Amino acid sequence: CSCSPVHPQQAFCNADIVIRAKAVNKKEVDSGNDIYGNPIKRIQYEIKQIKMFKGPDQDIEFIYTAPSSAVCGVSLDIGGKKEYLIAGKAEGNGNMHITLCDFIVPWDTLSATQKKSLNHRYQMGCECKITRCPMIPCYISSPDECLWMDWVTEKNINRHQAKFFACIKRSDGSCAWYRGAAPPKQEFLDIEDP
């Protein structure tokens, strides 16, 4: 299973459902057959939803994932102690599906800014595009992009820009990194400016 890293804001924008929840039970279930008629197994987590940040008007009861990490299956702690932020795809009927490529992290590892941004701020930036910079030099190709530099500057994708910044559209239609809750003003120097 391989996936490219995403900024938490991208994960929020790409997901159908974003919730804070804990897993209370786990079992293997059949979910139809593959093209050769073999049964497809999935793991079903029964969860207790604590808060929904994005999604349908109903609580999520079950989360499904593939049976092993080799096929991108996610392993959650059951027992109802550990809380997670879980972003994933809707399956209807109060169910969702997650893979290792989705944004799933223990709630207590999120920064205060990330937790606050889930309520409104990431949504404000969903029209912007976050482009990961794998090596210097890298450039934006349009004004609605923000360069995500964590990998280059700190050799880790879960660093400064991921923890403390959102990429928000300004009044002139361009996008810029911003730390705080109001939309950024034009006079701030963009991070990608030389």
Curated annotation (Swiss-Prot):
What family does this chain come from, according to its entry? Belongs to the protease inhibitor I35 (TIMP) family.
Which organism does this sequence originate in? Oryctolagus cuniculus (Rabbit)
Q: What is this protein called?
A: Metalloproteinase inhibitor 2
According to the record, the residues making up region (Involved in metalloproteinase-binding) are 1-4, 69-70
- Where located? Secreted
Q: Name one GO biological process term.
A: negative regulation of membrane protein ectodomain proteolysis
The SS bond pairs are: 1-72, 3-101, 13-126, 128-175, 133-138, 146-167
Give any Gene Ontology cellular component. extracellular space
Q: Name one Pfam family in it.
A: TIMP
